[in-house]
Structures are given as C-alpha cells and as structure tokens.
C-alpha cells in the first residue's frame, strides 16, 4: 500500500500543478482585460477545471508506464489500473464476458468505459471473516482476485474478476447478481441500516466494546480499553459509507460465520479502521474497534 500512496500523492501534485498553471495565465491585450471583468469568476473556474486539466491529466497518467513490480501486489496493480486509462484498455480481455443472472453478453473494446472503482472516494472497504485473513493483502502468490461493487440501495453486487495471466493481472469477466445471493448477505443487510441510523448504531453495540487506539503520547504504541454504547459518538470513525461499498476478495473464503471484520481504508492517507461485528442472540453487534 505504501507504493500506492506514493503514486496517488504524485498524482495529486501533478493535478495541482496543472490547475495552478492554468489559473496564473494572464490575458495579453487590454481588450481581454476589459472582457475579463465582465466574466463571472465561477465561470472561469469551471472552464479551467472541467476542460484542460482532465484531458491533460489523462495524457500524463497514460504516458507513465506502470512499474513491473506493481503486478506483484494486487493492490498496487488495482490503483494503477483504475487511474491509467491506457493501461486499463491493455489489461481487459476483450471481448469481455458479462454474466448477468442467467444471461451472458460481451463488451467490445470500442464500448468499454474506464472503470475508476473507488478512486474518486476518500476510502474503500473490505469484508473478512476474521483478522487472520488480513494477511492476504500482502500475498504476492495470488492468481485470482475479485473486486465487488456493492450498491446497497439497489441491492446489487457487480463482481470484477481479475486473473494473473503470464505474470500480468487482467480483468477477465464481470458477474452481476443481487445482494441476496452474496455470502455476506446477512451482514450487508444489517450494515445498510447501521450506516445511516444513529439510534440503531447505539443499539448495535456490545456492552462493552473493546477498543484499540493510538497512544497520544507515543507514536509507536497503542492503548487498549473499552467503551459503552452511549459513548459511541466519541469513537465513531467519521462518516460511514452508506450507498456503495467495495469489497476485494483476495481469496478469503466466507464460511457464513457469525463474525465479520469490516475494514475502512484511506485511499492515500494511511487511514485504517477495523470494526469487528459478531452475531449475539441472532443480532449483529459491534464487539471490537481498532483505529
């Protein structure tokens, strides 16, 4: 993930540089000066942001080759795949097979549209059965990974299936199903309400909840303790994603267990929160929080 963070930081710097460069240009003639006074500032900003930078950014990113090492770790590949349009077209097996329930179709090269996944969000999410499965994030021996796009409102799941072929990750198939066909269906149904209902959140706390937080007096240490349901607002990890979730299946097998580890990961800031939920008397409860 460190290489991914560096890549995204550089990407942000390039975008900033282009935007500032465009805004600092001044009209050369006095006639342009008089016209500029009559043009609303919002209009000028819109032109700068919506036209030049986006095209220029696509060209800059596409001209930057992905390092070979990015094919070793799937996360590194996925960040490059999502941001680099040229690379993405090279790494999709066309015609791309799409399975939608009982029907099959194919997407041709000319009809493909760049898939950014969660790159335009501040964070993405992962679902595991337990903490031991976190080791899969750094596994360089994987040869098949599934990226799930979960629409909570539409109750749908779109799976993007990637396979490593001749040492290179490629998108080989898309499978669409309902959320009710997903092995995490019980947890997803619970989470949809949990993410938006503050009263339900408090009701879904164990008593107490185990918590692990960074030690404010030591950057290299963590402190452990407990909190109770009424203290949840003090420990809640910001705004929870409520409309669309992403989940990456690195090979973990879901055993219809009574426990789920829900992970929130920042795109480029190193932020990570782990929330462990467990079914107690048939109801999902938050039992552990690691920030």
In which residue ranges do the predicted regions lie?
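Bacterial signal peptide processing site
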Residues: 22-26
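Bacterial N-terminal signal peptides that target proteins for export
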Residues: 1-9
């Amino acid at each position: 993930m460190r290489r991914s963070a560096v890549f995204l930081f550089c990407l942000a710097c390039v975008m900033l540089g282009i935007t500032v460069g465009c805004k600092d240009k001044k009209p050369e003639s006095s006639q342009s000066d008089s016209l500029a006074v009559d043009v609303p500032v919002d209009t000028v900003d819109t032109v700068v942001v919506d036209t030049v930078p986006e095209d220029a950014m696509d060209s800059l990113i596409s001209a930057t080759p992905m390092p070979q090492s990015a094919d070793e770790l799937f996360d590194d590949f996925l960040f490059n795949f999502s941001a680099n349009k040229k690379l993405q077209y090279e790494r999709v097996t066309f015609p791309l097979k799409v399975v939608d329930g009982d029907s099959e179709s194919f997407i041709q090269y000319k009809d493909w549209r760049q898939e950014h996944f969660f790159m335009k969000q501040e964070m993405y999410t992962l679902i595991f059965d337990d903490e031991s499965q976190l080791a899969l994030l750094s596994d360089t021996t994987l040869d098949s990974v599934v990226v799930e796009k979960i629409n909570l409102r539409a109750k749908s799941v779109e799976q993007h299936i990637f396979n490593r072929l001749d040492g290179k990750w490629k998108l080989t198939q898309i499978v669409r199903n309902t959320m009710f066909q997903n092995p995490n269906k019980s947890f997803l149904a619970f989470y949809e309400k949990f993410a938006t209902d503050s009263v339900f959140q408090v009701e879904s706390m164990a008593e107490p909840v185990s918590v692990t937080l960074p030690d404010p007096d030591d950057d290299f240490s963590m402190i452990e303790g407990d909190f109770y349901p009424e203290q949840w607002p003090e420990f809640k990890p910001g705004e929870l994603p409520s409309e669309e979730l992403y989940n990456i299946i690195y090979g973990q097998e879901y055993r219809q267990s009574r426990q789920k580890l829900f992970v929130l990961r920042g795109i480029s800031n190193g932020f990570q929160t782990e929330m462990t939920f467990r079914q107690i008397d048939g109801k999902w409860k938050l039992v552990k929080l690691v920030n």
